[in-house]
A protein has these predicted regions:
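Surface/interface-facing alpha-helical segments and adjacent flexible terminal/loop regions used
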Residues: 1-248
Length: 248
């Protein structure tokens, strides 16, 4: 590995902080009762998001602490997100802003295309591809690939990762995370998940701005839940079981 100058080293630190923020947020949003539960590492998460310039208020820290305990987090997760996409705060992108079921199918296919371009495959028993945890985990992996390229002075590879992250943010999480944050904040104010949803939206916003992207934000009133999955489009996700090999 080559010795990095100060600007490259600072950039590497920021990219790694972003990877940590996305990874820790993704883990926090996994269903605590599901087959791939994650942990909530509050201190590490706060350190990562604040390294990106996102301020975490004392009241937000206090709201998140109680759900570090998995049973408590599972209880709050069930209360807010429920077990169906038709619940009032669905953590799925395609329940927001679409006009018809075919639009959902197209959005899922587009999300899957981003994942596939980075060698990621759905895991058995995981979440649907448009779940917040899947989208955040994808951004974490893309950030790690960018960090790998920066550390080795591979500018072209770093640019590929940045461009992919920018396009994904513009078309997907950068658009709908503000809607989820608004919906959870309205339905369950002062809860740990209201804070986590807000942090996810703010981290994505800062990232998009750095990349020169201006996503067309959706709001909580743009939710359009449906009861059934479109035929042939029942997806799951969980990149823990994938093998996103980083090229040497």
């Amino acid at each position: 590995m080559q010795t990095l100058g100060a600007p490259a080293a600072e950039r590497l630190d920021r990219v790694l902080a972003r990877a940590d923020a996305y990874r820790l947020l993704a883990a926090a949003f996994r269903d605590p009762d599901g087959p791939l539960p994650g942990d909530l590492e509050t201190d590490a998460l706060i350190d990562a998001v604040e390294a990106l310039g996102v301020t975490v208020a004392p009241s937000e820290r206090e709201a998140v602490r109680p759900i570090e305990d998995r049973p408590a987090r599972a209880h709050e997760h069930r209360a807010i997100f429920g077990h169906t996409v038709a619940h009032g705060c669905p953590p799925y992108e395609t329940e927001y802003g679409r006009r018809h079921i075919f639009g959902q199918a197209q959005e899922l296919a587009d999300i899957g295309g981003f994942y596939g371009a980075f060698g990621l495959r759905p895991a058995n028993d995981g979440e649907r591809l448009d779940h917040i945890s899947c989208e955040l985990e994808f951004l974490a992996i893309v950030a790690l690939k960018e960090a790998y390229a920066v550390a080795r002075g591979h500018d072209d590879a770093a640019t590929i990762s940045r461009d992919a992250a920018g396009a994904f943010l513009r078309d997907h999480p950068g658009r709908w995370l503000p809607a989820l944050a608004g919906q959870v904040g309205r339905s369950a104010p002062h809860t740990g998940f209201a804070v986590l949803a807000s942090l996810a939206a703010r981290v994505a916003d800062v990232h998009a701005a750095e990349l020169g992207m201006v996503p067309d934000h959706l709001g909580p009133d743009d939710i359009r839940p449906i009861e059934d999955e479109p035929d042939g489009f029942v997806f799951t996700c969980g990149v823990d079981d994938a093998d996103p090999a980083i090229p040497g």
